[in-house]
Curated annotation (Swiss-Prot):
The chain crosses the membrane at residues 3-23, 39-59, 67-87, 109-129, 137-157, 172-192. It comes from Chromohalobacter salexigens (strain ATCC BAA-138 / DSM 3043 / CIP 106854 / NCIMB 13768 / 1H11). This is Putative manganese efflux pump MntP. Its main location: membrane. Keywords: Cell inner membrane, Cell membrane, Ion transport, Manganese, Membrane, Transmembrane, Transmembrane helix, Transport. It holds the Pfam family Mntp. It is a multi-pass membrane protein. Belongs to the MntP (TC 9.B.29) family. GO terms for molecular function: manganese ion transmembrane transporter activity. GO terms for cellular component: plasma membrane.
């Protein structure tokens, strides 16, 4: 995976968390920079760990699926991307995000971590997919974590001003990026077969 694809992947993986942080920021009466940085850091750490877990699972399964790994990567990324687009269009949030938004004064680190975990399940699935590609998983996880920390901090700070509309479109964009990366993975493999 080239650096541009890695950056796109990192920001695509941060869109769920960005949407959740906009909702969180919109619900808070006053958002302080330190609170936004703390929320961003928690989301970033969780989002960085999940692809590592998925990569470990995918690496174990690699010996069983090595002949069709590119197709699996394409299908998984396309399904994840499609789900993100559908969720953005339908404006449906997971229960953890709704719970966080209904308790705006509760800034418990555990509630933030639970919300971060709920929005990072797709990062674990992407980690499984990354095990099927030629990528430095540490670099990918760090990039995903940093992008998420940045996007969540900004989303929390801007939440009151921009509301939930941007969160919806961010999720749709993230889904389109994941589908595009899936197509690129499949194309690279098929182009490699054609030139062999």
């Amino acid at each position: 995976m080239n650096p541009a694809s890695l950056i796109l992947l990192a920001f695509a993986m941060s869109t769920d968390a960005f949407a959740a942080s906009i909702g969180r920021g919109a619900e808070l009466r006053k958002v302080r920079l330190l609170s936004a940085l703390r929320i961003g850091a928690v989301f970033g750490v969780v989002e960085a760990i999940m692809p590592l877990l998925g990569w470990a699972l995918g690496h174990v399964a690699m010996r069983f699926v090595s002949g069709v790994d590119h197709w699996i990567a394409f299908v998984m990324l396309a399904l994840l991307g499609g789900h993100m687009i559908w969720a953005g269009v339908k404006k449906e949030d997971c229960a953890a995000i709704k719970a966080a938004e209904t308790q705006p004064e509760n800034r418990s680190i555990w509630l933030i971590a639970f919300t971060a975990l709920a929005t990072s399940i797709d990062a674990m699935a992407v980690g499984i997919t990354l095990a099927l590609t030629d990528i430095n998983i540490i670099a990918a996880s760090v990039a995903i974590g940093l992008a998420t920390a940045l996007m969540v901090t900004l989303g929390t700070l801007l939440g009151r001003a921009i509301g939930t509309i941007v969160g919806k479109w961010a999720e749709i964009l993230g889904g389109l990026i994941l589908i595009g990366i899936g197509i690129a993975v499949l194309y690279e493999h098929l182009a490699g077969l054609a030139s062999a």
